[in-house]
Amino acid sequence: MSQTNDKPALHLVPSFYGVYILKSIPKPRRTYIGSTPDPKRRLRQHNGDLKVGGAYRTKKDGSRPWTMVVLVHGFPSRIAALQFEHSLQHAYQTRHINNDARITSSSRQSSMHSKLANIRLLTTSFDKMSLKIAIFDEEVYRMWVENKHKIECNVPCTLFKFDEFCNSIQEIDIEDAKNILLGKQLDCMVCKASIDYFKDSTPNISSREELSNYLAKGNYPLIGICGDHAFHLSCIARQRGPAMVPKSVTCTTCGQKLDWSDIIKVSTRLRHYVVQDSLHLAITQL
């Protein structure tokens, strides 16, 4: 393993990551599929408004300007988004679409109806993630509602104005959670065990493997905050029933319904903050 890859690292669930479809304005039948944590900036790159970035395919043949028409978002990692992106680009062969359900049989450019149908098919394979779909074009939204290929999809889909949607994307704020954690001794409201995030002594850790082994022993477990209460994610996740990952959980103290994707975003950042400070590490974000 290289020295760079062996540095201590923790996974942070991104504030935002999405897979998008662009449509060329001068050549409406031409489309492009990509992924990004910043849709507004990425569109500017594709259109040449920013000198750095973009993609060769969106620069050539008089296809500019482009407009973003569809954005699937809510991915828990860049890797998950890239998997969805690759599957949407290669819907004719991806393992994430069952052969008997496949509607795209070749790598040739497919219609917007087909792309929307493939999104519907892919969400079944990615159903453990709290995905949502934003559409920024009224005609494309009409196609989604029409559902030409009659494929069921339980992922919420909403028509937005592009700029308004992008302006609504916010970084995850953990200040309130930090204040609760620092303010008093917390017990898990499910198992009642003390949440020990502040230790009298900590080991010297210099590698990713050492940090992984230390956390695997139960040190700095992922925790969630609701009001001034806390819980181990492993405890409250038992509400999930047969699902591997819950879509939401209910606070056992106040009864509030909590979105799992929001909980995990705060939880991974809170642990990153405490571990980095307590172990005196410069931790890489995965």
From Swiss-Prot:
Its EC number is 3.1.-.-. It is found in: Nucleus. Residues 15-98 form the GIY-YIG domain. Keywords: DNA damage, DNA recombination, DNA repair, Endonuclease, Hydrolase, Nuclease, Nucleus. SUPFAM superfamilies: GIY-YIG endonuclease (SSF82771), RING/U-box (SSF57850). One of its GO terms (cellular component) is Slx1-Slx4 complex. Pfam families: GIY-YIG (PF01541). Forms a heterodimer with SLX4. PANTHER family: STRUCTURE-SPECIFIC ENDONUCLEASE SUBUNIT SLX1. Catalytic subunit of the SLX1-SLX4 structure-specific endonuclease that resolves DNA secondary structures generated during DNA repair and recombination. Has endonuclease activity towards branched DNA substrates, introducing single-strand cuts in duplex DNA close to junctions with ss-DNA. This is Structure-specific endonuclease subunit SLX1. The gene is SLX1.
